[in-house]
Amino acid sequence: LKANTSPVTNTFKAATSEIKIEEKTDDGIKSEIYVKNEGTATSYVRVKLVCNWVDKDGNVSATPVPAPTITNSDWFEKDGIYYYTKPVGPKDSTANLLKDPITQPNAPEGCHLEVTVLAESIQAAPSKAVTDSWGVRVDNNGYLTQPTTTP
């Protein structure tokens, strides 16, 4: 018996978790915010909104800006960060983060509201990595949930 084999090249390509923030504005006011999964791995997404009053010279005002209220049931807030509850497949997008356009009354004189959207994604599998990295749970349906605290 004689075994004769030639080398076989196995090509493996790692999955990627890449996202793109998509915003729509209405008269310069952010009215819709989505996050699109441009990677190859199903991923979870979280977003932080940084709101500042900015004057005509680009200086940030010391006046605090309250965070906008998010009431979309596909998102939940934990420590100022909004988590999309559903895993986002490749080339898919989250639901709109905003229920209403972001507006803030009572701007300091000479200032306008500037909203910066910061987003982050993490590969959905293994779910333990999501829990360890972000401190949120993945339920039996694959949805993100806030961790429960017991007194």
Predicted regions, residues:
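Long, small/polar-residue-biased beta-strand-and-loop interaction regions
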Residues: L1-P151
